[in-house]
Amino acid sequence: IKNHQSKQIVVFGVGDYTNSREDVHYVKCVSEDELLEKFLKFWETHKPDVITGWNSKFYDLPYLIHRIKYRFGEDAVKRLSVWKTVYKDSVYIQGKEHICYNVFGLEQLDYLDLYRKFTYSSQESYRLDHIAFVELGERKDPNPYDTFREWYTKDFQSFIDYNIQDVEIVDRLEDKMKLIDLILTMAYNAKCNYGDVFSQVRM
């Protein structure tokens, strides 16, 4: 998790991680249950209004919700919402169903969606690695193993570094492109919710 204003990063993990950065706070946990509980307490304390990520709408948030639900049950998922209301939804893209969630009181501005809608350019790939190279001239660290699970279990240090890099790339994209700033301004001028900016009809 990275705060765009303060630039501080908080990382939750189950394993030993050597942290040498002042802008990174590593929260070591002994189990997945402890990690999820500490994450939920962090979330409830800071109460984010807007979150972003690269394909976070269809991957990061659904994965997180599925793990919380599996470990703690449906009621624990409601802790992500200031209104204690979370709805499951589905969207069909090119004939394939994608699961997403509506967390009341939280606006999800997926940076992949923002980039596709507001850059008015067509890319050969919308993988974060490619967009980072096009826009920032940098590449993501490659996975040195066959699977992410293997990477996680065999080299936890570089695996965490990789995840931090993911967050920082999205943050640097926003520093350069100001797409979230654009959304906030458009929503303010149109007197609509942030997510409604994606729909011309609602605006």
Question: Residues of each region from the PLM?
Answer:
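Secondary-structure transition/capping motifs at alpha-helix termini
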Residues: 2-6, 45, 70-79, 180
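A short acidic (Asp/Glu
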Residues: 56, 61-67
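Short glycine-rich phosphate-binding loop at a beta-alpha junction
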Residues: 48-56, 186
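Amphipathic alpha-helical segments that form well-ordered structural scaffolds
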Residues: 38, 63, 131, 169-173
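Active-site-proximal helix-loop-helix substrate-binding element of RNase H-like nuclease domains
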Residues: 21-26, 61, 70, 75-167
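Common nucleic-acid-contacting/processivity interface regions adjacent to the catalytic cores
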Residues: 149-203
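Conserved RNase H-like, two-metal-ion catalytic cores of nucleic-acid enzymes
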Residues: 1-50
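Short secondary-structure boundary/capping segments
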Residues: 65-75, 187, 203
